[in-house]
Amino acid sequence: MLNVPSQSFPGPSSQQRVASGGRSKVPLKQGRSLMDWIRLTKSGKDLTGLKGRLIEVTEEELKKHNKKDDCWICIRGFVYNVSPYMEYHPGGEDELMRAAGSDGTDLFDQVHRWVNYESMLKECLVGRMAMKPALPKDYHEEKKVLNGMLPQSQVTDTLAKEGPSSPSYDWFQTDSLVTIVIYTKQKDINLDSVIVDHRDDSFRAETVIKDYSYLVHVALSHEIQEDFSVLVVENVGKIEIVLKKKENTSWKCLGHPQENHNSFIPKKDTGLFYRKCQLVSKEDVTHDTKLFCLMLPPSTHLEVPVGQHVYLRLPITGTEIVKPYTPVCDSLFSEFKEPVLPNNIYIYFLIKIYPAGFFTPELDQLQIGDYVSVSNPEGNFIISQLQELEDLFLLAAGTGFTPMVKVLNYALTNIPSLRKVKLMFFNKTEDDIIWRSQLEKLAFKDKRFEVEFVLSAPTSEWSGKQGYISPALLSEFLKRRSDTSKVLICLCGPTPFTEQGMKMLHDLNFSKDEIHSFTA
């Protein structure tokens, strides 16, 4: 489906590419880069064929536009004429044609739902699909605001039969506080399960329950202070969000419903939500990799779960470009630092700067105090995989090390059964090794941790392992304590590294349940 053209970052073999999916790319003609596409969209040329009109499109009308020179695609209810984009799409024309004349939302989400198609294709917008309203007509009645019971029409048949129990919410107040209570009916809820944003009068609380998302989204009836608190009662799955009133007056209602309020739908069907975060520091880690520190707004509660990634969004030459990155800790020894503010308001990223890239040079040019939009977390790593684990093996190449940082820290800190954590870290040269001294210090401090560095282009002075990922290296590295010991192997790097590694691990008789590949 729709993809950012070939000059985009991460490149097809980059270890920072999160959602590669193994798709093949088609070489683009000269003059068909992302910059060329942006120039075309800014040229004033009519790319829709409708001379600036927006129309309502029926299913019958959409089906008629299914040819390469007349191709309309629907994404999340909006219809685009992608015919002009055909030659600019690195996945090739055939990939786009899979959704010609139809709703391409599912195909789009399977490959790269993170791409900001609204910005990329805004000059190709034909109009909206003609469809019935998603919410019942009486949805905006005040009783729906006061009582957080989920309307039956919001629960799909599939969800009712197979998904988790439907959550609900309620609220109560004192003279100075308003407390919103979300009843998840799940016991594995914690602080990173809920994301809260308050902007102007808009209040948004999204709770992730397995593969579903429950949303409380209202325009508050009165003003509140910027800061709030979030509490989770884990054994009953109750979330309490405590807001501070600006004035000690009684509220007659919580507020008025906003888009998708009180909905409980598969997470894959939700759009990405962003908030602006401030760049507070940027420091060199290697010759081409930097540690970026972003600060969340005080009106946001967001904790990125272990093994998950977020999307960074920047406006570049008038178009919003989005790229996925996995947050890390600020250090492998964070406990020795004295934070100025609570740790959970900062998000850290190890990012390799590509001088010829499209995104990272712009990111690198940001000044302290500038803003970057950060999305809600995504990812399919399940932290319960680490429970009762005896041996954890980490295979990382380059910046494929980033998802390993939090996994490593969490395992050493929280898994009592853990016997050994071993990291095999592949790089080109010694200068490319991220946090080498920290890794060596950690291995000295905690005897459960071992690290091996493997270089593909070492100097003559290098005495460590050399080469690329191979069956011989892996069979020597991956030693089980016993045939019955519980192990997990995590793998992340450029696409060829990951694909080869997966095949080698299967050939070494490790089961699918014992392997996690960070490719989203």
Curated annotation (Swiss-Prot):
Catalysed reaction equations from the record: 2 Fe(III)-[cytochrome b5] + NADH = 2 Fe(II)-[cytochrome b5] + NAD(+) + H(+)
Enzyme Commission code: 1.6.2.2
Residue ranges that the Swiss-Prot or TrEMBL entry lists as coiled coil: none
Subcellular location: Endoplasmic reticulum
Chain positions recorded as FAD binding sites: 364-379, 391-423
Enzyme class, first EC level, given as a word: oxidoreductase
Cited SUPFAM superfamilies: Cytochrome b5-like heme/steroid binding domain, Ferredoxin reductase-like, C-terminal NADP-linked domain, HSP20-like chaperones, Riboflavin synthase domain-like
Residues given in the record as heme binding sites: H89, H112
UniProt-recorded name of the protein: Cytochrome b5 reductase 4
Organism name: Bos taurus
